[in-house]
Amino acid sequence: MAATRRQQIIWPRLLCFLALCALLIALLIWGGVQLLRPAADEVMEKMYPRTYQELIETYSAEYDVDPYLVYAVCKIESNFDPKAQSNVGARGVMQMMEPAFDWVQYRMGDESGTTYDQMYQPEVAIQYGTCMLSLLQKEMGEDERVILASYHAGMGAVQAWLEDPAYSSDGETLDTIPYSDTNWYVEKVLETKAIYQQLYE
């Protein structure tokens, strides 16, 4: 009887103690997360910087393009390196090829004398690259996968995919991107855009 009575006294106290311990551990974990979050955000902001922020914000507003998409393209294309040049000849922060430059210049009506050699200048590269994203948005529709695939593989290839039921079920979006490098590029840019939004919105 005495043992039973002791158990009746001890068990509620033990359960209460364990509950308090669990609460204390939860509070410690929560506090640790709150303390570490600013440091983690700082590390992420260094990994995903808003380089050329003024230029990107200015031309994104001018051409009605999501600035986070422009940051993501710059990050994946060149890691914001203005002197970047690919093995196929794409130049600058947004890695534009010369035929694309000529097309954008014509569509912009730019008669300032800007040349492809100036694509190594961040302002020229960002203006032309952002304008190209805007033009693709108007030509190919609002779907970002389609826009980015067009930026990477060209409008002709993407239009052919949209017309092929194997790649597009509705003619407006891409269910599958047949070029593995373009598929990787699109997914990587969208993933990077989401990180920028999470960090800076």
Task: Locate predicted features.
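A general, composition-driven signal for non-globular sequence regions
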Residues: 1-2, 7, 28, 71, ...
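N-terminal export signals and maturation junctions of secreted/periplasmic proteins
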Residues: 2-58
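Catalytic glycan-binding domains that act on GlcNAc-containing polysaccharides
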Residues: 33-201
